[in-house]
């Protein structure tokens, strides 16, 4: 099978509708089962992406209440399955966790009643992204694909210094000295992640501005300490 995520974590990259349609057709022609992670659907800033289910009768689509609906911790989601997988998936679900409780299901249904508030959150995420892109050193994002969805930026450390930087050391020092938390890229990519870090902008816009100021104030001294 082929597993894809759009919008993606950790990069925030959103696949074009044409690319999703093309991949669906390729998978169908080559007998490959497509598993599409659409957990960050709704959190896009330029266009609303299509769903793989609109282009394929055999694709598996996975979604969640955690991200767009702001229900992280409820551990609720859903799958859209082709007919040939319904029975076996139902058996697995019944044996693994039976199902969510009735109050959880009622709460999830209520989440569909207020898209105005949810879309306001998306506007805030977009503003937060723009703050970080504007305020942080441009070297962070020079070679990265545009982050048009989710609420993450995947920053590149290779252009910040002539000396190679280790992402794990970098994020630990930034947390300890600048009091800004982010995630080392090695959590997502064991081969090249040591040169990248993921920033989340799911918080308040004020927090994004404060974080940018702290990083900009801290970064020169940190880079200087490495060369001394």
Language model segments and positions:
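A generic structural signal for well-ordered alpha-helical segments
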Residues: 27, 136-137, 174-175
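Conserved core segment of the aminotransferase class I/II
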Residues: 57-126, 130-135, 217-220, 224-226
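Conserved glycine-rich beta-strand-loop-beta hairpin in the small C-terminal domain of fold type I
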Residues: 109, 125-133, 144-158
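A short linear hydrophobic-aromatic micro-motif
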Residues: 140-144, 181-187
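PLP-dependent enzyme catalytic core of the Aspartate aminotransferase-like
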Residues: 163-165, 173-181, 188-228
